[in-house]
From Swiss-Prot:
Keywords in alphabetical order: Cytoplasm, Hydrolase, RNA-binding, tRNA-binding
Primary localization: cytoplasm
Location of the active site: 22 (proton acceptor)
Subunit structure: Monomer.
Record protein name field: Peptidyl-tRNA hydrolase
Matching Pfam families: Pept_tRNA_hydro (PF01195)
Site location (Stabilizes the basic form of H active site to accept a proton): 95
UniProt xrefs under InterPro entries: Pept_tRNA_hydro (IPR001328), Pept_tRNA_hydro_CS (IPR018171), Pept_tRNA_hydro_sf (IPR036416)
HAMAP family per the UniProt record, alphabetical: Pept_tRNA_hydro_bact
Compartments, as annotated in UniProt: Cytoplasm
Function per UniProt: Hydrolyzes ribosome-free peptidyl-tRNAs (with 1 or more amino acids incorporated), which drop off the ribosome during protein synthesis, or as a result of ribosome stalling.
Example of a GO cellular component annotation carried by this entry: cytoplasm
Stored PROSITE patterns: PEPT_TRNA_HYDROL_2
């Protein structure tokens, strides 16, 4: 059975994007690093900011691509190749429009669902056989509003809900790392 060796937090690089809904993946890995007293260092060769942590006695690389969302797969594939990490050993954390704020879901494989970061990762890895932790940000109501919505900051109430979802996901990280997926899915997917 595989174990997770890399956690990718999707988002866009730059202060103007740091607090936007599209960067909730980055928020997630930043919280893991903070909880483990680690900081990220820039790795231009691998097109990312990297931190290394130990989760339940497993060495895990935290990756924040510095390529912008639409080319996240470049960094993911470079890091995976450098550390010899298989797609099944990767957890990608990202924003999800089709899930309410405060909700979080775990998924293995599947399509990109219009998410450009996932599309890029699928293309660069040549597979969609990796785990995803989908953090709900809610939907603006009409597809014409999506681009502005994901690139804007959440309300204070929505930010609290998203932070709560992140904390909830981190509570299950040991089991996710060790591929104990069924109990995690059962708990996360039950209201």
């Amino acid at each position: 059975m595989p174990k997770i060796k890399m956690i990718v937090g999707l988002g866009n690089i730059g202060k103007e994007y740091q607090d936007t809904r599209h960067n909730v993946g980055e928020w997630f890995i930043a919280k893991i690093a903070q909880d483990n007293n680690q900081s990220f260092s820039s790795n231009p060769k691998l097109n990312c900011n990297l931190a290394k942590v130990s989760i339940d006695y497993n060495n895990v690389v935290l990756v924040f691509p510095t390529t912008y969302m639409n080319n996240s797969g470049l960094a993911v594939s470079k890091v995976a190749n450098f550390y010899k990490i298989a797609p099944a050993e990767i957890l990608v954390v990202h924003d999800e429009l089709d899930i309410d704020s405060g909700e979080i879901r775990l998924k293995k494989g599947g399509g990109h669902g219009g998410h450009n970061g996932l599309r890029s990762i699928n293309q660069h890895l040549g597979t969609n056989d990796y785990l995803r932790l989908r953090i709900g940000i809610g939907h603006p109501g009409h597809k014409s509003k999506v681009a502005n919505y994901v690139l804007s900051n959440p309300s204070i109430a929505q930010k609290k809900d998203i932070d709560s979802a992140i904390d909830n996901g981190i509570c299950f990280l040991d089991d996710i790392i060790n591929y104990k997926l069924e109990p995690v899915m059962q708990k996360l997917h039950t209201k």
